[in-house]
């Protein structure tokens, strides 16, 4: 019974870290395919980003910081055993988002980007910043469950930083409308992600509890009288 209980509790952790491993692979892929121009001065993409290269660098460094610290924020072990570290990482995450999100909105609504995505960029960057700060206000008010939900939502918007670039692995070019549709879809998914994740987690716990109850009942029936 103890081993089955441990395996049931380990199941969500396995899913969580498998997800983060997949995201790590996505990050490496995006860095190689889409961000390689940083180490290649002859890359023609430099001409496109030249007017905002320092802002882009600031946005990128802050975004990577949010991505890394946000991942560690999801560690239940750090939350349990290293509370001070968890809080420090949370503050670094908030600071990184506070820097990166407004810069993203500024660049995303400039003439460097297609008209079709400029309005979306306000929502994407705005929700990213808003959800991070709501998560912070919730934890300062002692509302742990609300903090968790808003932190998941904020981190989902952080992942857009990576996932929106994945199509570049397969397509060298696509329409402005295609980019807009993809980004709006990610905004919607990011907005509802806490409900999806927390609902799935709750249903998994219920299923595991019922399975343990059935095994316990079966063991009781087989016990010697």
Describe the residue ranges of each PLM region.
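Alpha-helical membrane insertion/targeting regions
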Residues: 2-225
